Amino acid sequence: PSGSMENTIMTGDRVIGSRLSYKFHEPERGDIAIFHFPDDPTGKTLYVKRIIGLPGETVDIVDSQVYINGEPLDEPYIREPMDPEEPMHFEVPEGCYFMMGDNRNYSSDARYWQNHYVAEDQIIAKVLFRYYPFSKISWLDE
């Protein structure tokens, strides 16, 4: 992964994802997912981001705060507030998800993509575990 998920996942970390997770359960807000980047027509580019918006929800970003359906989202994994930007509004279509990196000021994520939403069939795994570096082995799905 790139630096977009720091400090949760650092550049150079290695993770294990489960392809089976989403065979039995729908993706949930807060999951860290591996998915096909929606702006890559070849479908070969994989991204790792956190699921923020679920199907049918609205996502607003105002004064560095993320709101889901008008309610502020509690994000204890964020290391620093987002740099101020113009307010943003997104309406997540059914069958799609809105993804953001934890390192918001250095993340190329759904806020800036041409195709803002990731279709459920583009999500290939839920990140469960960091196995490298060995000194930082840990579960990431808690």
What positions do the PLM features span?
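Soluble "head" domains of membrane/secretory-pathway proteins
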Residues: 6-142
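Aromatic-capped interface at the extracytoplasmic side
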Residues: 1-5
